[in-house]
Design a protein with these regions (language model features):
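Residues forming the flavin
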Residues: 1-186
Length: 186
């Protein structure tokens, strides 16, 4: 909701402590951090660790290789897509693709749409979407739902609960942080 503060659980505090983000106890079981500090210091830490952050792009497709394993993504500039210009996209190869696209699980849905017979590691083999909001339960199952759901494709964050039909989470971000950590470990 673009608020100036975000809430995390104590379990995720160590991730912020590691990169110097200040957290203040709000009430038992919850900490509050400055949203701008969290985003800017997290981005800087990721860049310092070797990540590349591309802004203003859309994922149009996935790259596949033997056995229809996901081996990268096909991207284009968001402005190109919005203007409906005919500009060739660019393929980016990757050992593993992490779908952290949120509630829509866009990469997973693209795999299901474009690869005949593809099935996700989910209750029905598809992307059923999240159940209605139950923030505490959604946070509780999020790390468990963070996993490889198709060869070469890992889900994290809200996309993980969308694929696993977990409850929608509320405006608490600790589970999202721990889900991202888990995805990186996979």
């Amino acid at each position: 909701m673009l608020l100036p503060k975000i809430v995390i659980e104590p379990e995720a505090r160590r991730l912020f402590d590691d990169i110097g983000i200040r957290a203040v106890t709000w009430q038992e079981g919850y900490l509050v951090v400055d949203a701008v500090e969290a985003v800017s210091k997290s981005a800087a830490a990721a860049l310092n660790a070797g990540a590349r952050i591309w802004v203003g792009i859309n994922i149009e497709d996935v790259v596949i290789r033997e056995g229809d394993r996901v081996a990268g993504v096909v991207v284009n500039w968001h402005a190109v897509s919005e203007a409906r210009l005919h500009v060739d996209p660019m393929a980016l190869r990757a050992k593993v693709v992490i779908d952290a696209t949120g509630h829509d699980a866009t990469v997973c849905r693209g795999v299901l749409r474009k690869i005949p017979g593809a099935r996700m590691l989910s209750p029905q083999g598809d992307v059923p979407g999240e159940k209605p909001m139950w923030a505490a339960q959604g946070e509780a199952v999020l790390v468990e739902n963070t996993r490889e759901v198709y060869p070469g494709l890992v889900v994290a964050g809200m996309a993980a609960n969308a694929v696993a039909a977990g409850p929608r989470m509320g405006a608490v971000f600790g589970g999202m942080l721990l889900s991202g950590e888990r995805a990186a470990e996979i």
